[in-house]
Amino acid sequence: FRYKLLAQEASIFRKLTVEDNLRAILQTRNLSKKEQDKKIDDLLEEFNITHIRTRLGMQLSGGERRRVEIARGLALEPHFILLDEPFAGIDPLAVADIQGIISYLKERGMGILITDHNVRETLQIVDRAYIMNSGQILLEGDSDTIANSELARKFYLGEDFKL
């Protein structure tokens, strides 16, 4: 059973190209250079980042960086992925892009756990959500249950919250 944590903080190598960021991870696996090249091409295509292949990590926008981090994490072929604040520090178009990637990963059967304070963006894509207060689970349920809960509104969402 393999899992991958993608932290909120940038985790790509800033002075390496996107391609070399992917290769750095693939070199930890027992793959030939030809197999690495094929996997890199596949990941670049799958996550729509072929056009930034030769750009340095420090030159990427927040959304591009997030897509590269996800692709890099999936190079290890995990069964489960933990996303910490995936919507932090990215523009609205990138949010929609990351939501699409998460939905795609769900369709592939990958287990996904998201921790995020951007509740609206998160509730739009999850099957189940948990609201915590003081380290305890206050409420759990599907997105509609959470969004319509008086308890969630009182302690976290606010009275005017709408999905």
Feature map (PLM): residue ranges:
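Short coil-to-helix segment of the ABC ATPase nucleotide-binding domain corresponding to the Q-loop/switch region
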Residues: K15-R23
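Conserved ABC ATPase "signature" region
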Residues: R23, K34-I52, G100-S103, L151
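Conserved catalytic motifs of ABC-family nucleotide-binding domains
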Residues: E77
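Catalytic Walker B motif of ABC-type/P-loop ATPase nucleotide-binding domains
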Residues: I81-D84
